[in-house]
Amino acid sequence: MGVNDEFMELLIQMGPEMKPPKNIGSYVMEQALEVPIDQKLAFKYLWQSNEYLKEEEAFCNSIGFLLNKESSVAILFFYKGQAESLFYLIDVQTYNYKTGKLIDEINGVAGFKGDDAVCNMQVNSYNEIVFKTLAAGQTNEIVLNISNKGKIQR
């Protein structure tokens, strides 16, 4: 497959590859809090070596990832922060998985908090992911369209 070795290690830690169609709810997302991503890899890739953050503060947990093998694009779904957070915001990043280079990202696309706010992620295809959040009796839906080059449109 010709993947950057360090980026491949990140993908292994992200868990099994998701295949569309796939539906993931808050309960499954919460289970990921039990398995954090290595802080060195999280700092380098998911936090993009943020100058305002120390490596030992780079907490991340995986929701999953997709690989569009036709265009060498990896789509990562995760949340940043400690597992004990009160609210979890979902971030999405796209990478060229052969080089490990970031293509695009969107932070805080959806969120959940125990029983007070629930989220559902529906992966229709490699190019369309729908997030539905229900909080305080209101439903919010966000559709992400991801081009074959990895660009994210909301």
Predicted regions and their residues:
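Terminal domain-start segments
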Residues: 1-60
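Beta-propeller domains
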Residues: 34-52, 84-103
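A short, amphipathic edge element
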Residues: 53-61, 87-88, 112-115
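Beta-strand-rich domains and repeat architectures in extracellular enzymes and scaffolds
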Residues: 55-78
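Hydrophobic/aromatic beta-strand elements that line small-molecule binding cavities or substrate pockets
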Residues: 63-65, 91-95, 118-121, 142-144
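Short beta-strand elements that form the blades of beta-propeller/WD-repeat-like
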Residues: 70-86, 122-135
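Structural motif
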Residues: 82-93, 137-145
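Short aromatic loop motif centered on NTY/YTY
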Residues: 103-154
